[in-house]
Swiss-Prot record:
It comes from Streptomyces coelicolor (strain ATCC BAA-471 / A3(2) / M145). GO terms for molecular function: carbohydrate derivative binding; glucose-6-phosphate isomerase activity; monosaccharide binding. This is Glucose-6-phosphate isomerase 1. The lineage of its organism: Bacteria, Bacillati, Actinomycetota, Actinomycetes, Kitasatosporales. GO terms for cellular component: cytosol. GO terms for biological process: gluconeogenesis; glucose 6-phosphate metabolic process; glycolytic process. Keywords: Cytoplasm, Gluconeogenesis, Glycolysis, Isomerase. It catalyses: alpha-D-glucose 6-phosphate = beta-D-fructose 6-phosphate.
Length: 550
């Protein structure tokens, strides 16, 4: 039995709890800035192209020092180094965690079980690049000899969210002669809408499933195969020219009709939610080209090296992870908003939902004991300025503490017209105004000074002290996207290390899958399913009745 004290019994934890209740019970950002004129410049971290301003957080130098002591006591740096060394830190699956190897330079040496995996990584990247170039140039043609103009990625979870998010983020860098679509939902409507206006002769499907057995993905892939064959006269040979696989199961890939020469591998030391810079990113590489894809990998690597080498408090992922622990475990926050002021980042928060909530949505520690502290928050948000006309009301004047990240860029993408570029200043005016309003609010006296009737003063008062991080970069490029993703990857790692949970398994997704296999015969064949609870049994019966209504 370990002699290591539980997290909430550590003196560093107790010191933070005392600090939250005693020294800093009601932090006021107006006072903190007034007391420290240099706060705005001191509370900034720079990494790569990112300027990260954390001055509007409910912390003091003492808070930050105590948080850093907690990180040291919980062995964050040791676990970080073990991850980079390729040790099996995913303890429940006995796996290494080496998504960082996916963006390592060719001359790096990163070993798993004594074998350098970097040559394998670059062999797959080179194979991807060769294939992507053939599709982009028109050298790769479909069964009828026509060039590919449509690419449909079929996957789910990490095999979908990552490439779909990155494609939207980097649309300005894509080949606009190519149409990319992403299918993940086993709801047949998803595939139907994705292909309904496409020409099968010009469509390539990328099937992303490591085992080639993922039920949602293979169901959609089989339906896509039927759609293709229906459109091309039923010739089975067409499959090999219109389907490629991201998988390691050569036998099942071949059985499907895919040429295993067009199978792109990845490894069990890459978790799904960390995988889109592996072969899972093939659709993105086709869209933006191999050179841009490698620029994105360079961006990942910038933050990887920063996380590995920068000392606190200048280590950005460590800092952001500690701030999350501060709010969740000591100030009672239950959620975290990520608010990108870029239309191109419309799927970024959804991507972070999987990254964060699947990683740290755990209630037992690494030893299997129930945790006695808060773990991962609910992550949510949409691009600005849309959210301002929806849920910002609750953030400003509601009863919940919701830390928020604001992500913005100084320049719009080049391909916009001059008139549309001019709108960017309006977008960013809102970006800066919201963080100011959230931090400093509007006092009753300030409201009264505007001549507001006394009975309306409480309604128009903003208490402020809503914490935000501002992440600012010159523009959204492939490298900057890689930097942003790696920043959040390592932030999530830091929090999992402090909470002593395994951030790299996801057993919570399994039970529903198992039960779905048992329930399906009741829906399709009317079979009895033993063990259904009364509520679910009644719902299944109602479903069957409704199916028969026309």
């Amino acid at each position: 039995m370990s002699d290591t004290p539980k997290l909430n019994q550590r003196p560093e934890w107790t010191a933070l709890a005392d600090h939250a209740k005693g020294t800093l019970p009601h932090p006021d950002l107006r006072e903190l800035f007034a007391q420290d004129p240099g706060r705005a410049e001191r509370y900034v971290v720079r990494v790569g192209d990112l300027r990260i301003d954390y001055s509007k957080h409910l912390v003091t130098d003492e808070t930050l020092a105590l948080l850093q002591e907690l990180a040291a006591a919980t062995g964050v740096s040791g676990l970080r180094d073990a991850m980079f060394r390729g040790e099996r830190i995913n303890i429940t699956e006995d796996r290494a965690v080496l998504h960082t190897a996916l963006r390592a330079p060719r001359d790096a040496v990163i070993e798993v079980d004594g074998e350098n995996v970097v040559p394998q990584v670059h062999a797959v990247l080179d194979k991807m690049a060769g294939f992507a170039d053939r599709v982009r140039s028109g050298e790769w043609t479909g069964h009828t000899g026509r060039r590919i103009r449509n690419v449909v990625n079929i996957g789910i979870g990490g095999s979908d969210l990552g490439p779909a998010m990155a494609y939207e983020a980097l649309r300005a860098f894509t080949d606009r002669s190519l149409t990319l679509r992403f299918v993940s939902n086993v709801d047949g409507a998803d595939l139907h809408e994705a292909v309904r206006d496409l020409d099968p002769a010009e469509t390539l499907f990328i099937i992303a499933s490591k085992t080639f057995t993922t039920i949602e993905t293979i169901t959609n892939a089989t339906s896509a195969r039927s759609w293709l064959l229906d459109g091309l006269g039923g010739d089975e040979k067409a499959v090999a020219k219109h389907f490629v696989a991201l998988s390691t199961n050569a036998e099942k890939v071949a059985d499907f009709g895919i040429d295993t020469a067009n199978m792109f591998e990845f490894w069990d030391w890459v978790g799904g939610r960390y995988s889109f810079d592996s072969a899972i990113g093939l659709s993105l590489m086709i869209a933006i080209g191999p050179d841009r894809f490698r620029e994105m990998l360079d961006g990942f690597r910038i933050v990887d090296e920063h996380f590995r080498n920068a000392e606190a408090p200048a280590n950005a992922p460590l800092l952001l992870g500690l701030l999350g622990v501060w709010y969740g475990d000591f100030l009672g926050a239950q959620s975290h908003a990520v608010l990108p002021y870029s239309h191109y980042l419309s799927k970024f928060t959804a991507y972070l939902q999987q990254l964060d909530m699947e990683s740290n949505g755990k209630s037992v520690d690494r030893e299997g004991n129930p945790v006695q502290w808060q773990t991962g928050p609910v992550v949510w948000g949409t691009p600005g300025t849309n959210g301002q006309h929806a849920y910002y009301q609750l953030i400003h004047q509601g009863t919940k503490l919701i830390p928020a990240d604001f992500i913005g860029f100084a320049r719009p993408v080049d391909e916009l017209s001059e008139e549309l570029k001019a709108q960017h200043d309006l977008l960013m005016a809102n970006f800066f105004a919201q963080t100011q309003a959230l931090a400093f609010g509007k006092t009753p006296d300030e409201v009264r000074a505007e001549g507001v009737p006394e009975e309306l003063v409480p309604h128009k008062t903003f208490r402020g002290n809503h914490p935000t991080t501002t992440v600012l970069a010159a523009e959204l490029t492939p490298s900057v996207l890689g930097q942003l993703i790696a920043l959040y990857e390592h932030k999530v790692f830091v929090q999992g290390a402090i909470w002593n949970i395994d951030s790299f398994d996801q057993w919570g997704v399994e039970l529903g899958k198992v039960l779905a296999k048992r329930v399906e015969p009741a829906l399709t064949e009317g079979a009895d399913v033993p063990g259904l609870d009364p509520s679910t049994a009644a719902l299944v019966a109602a479903y069957r009745e409704l199916k028969e209504v026309h």
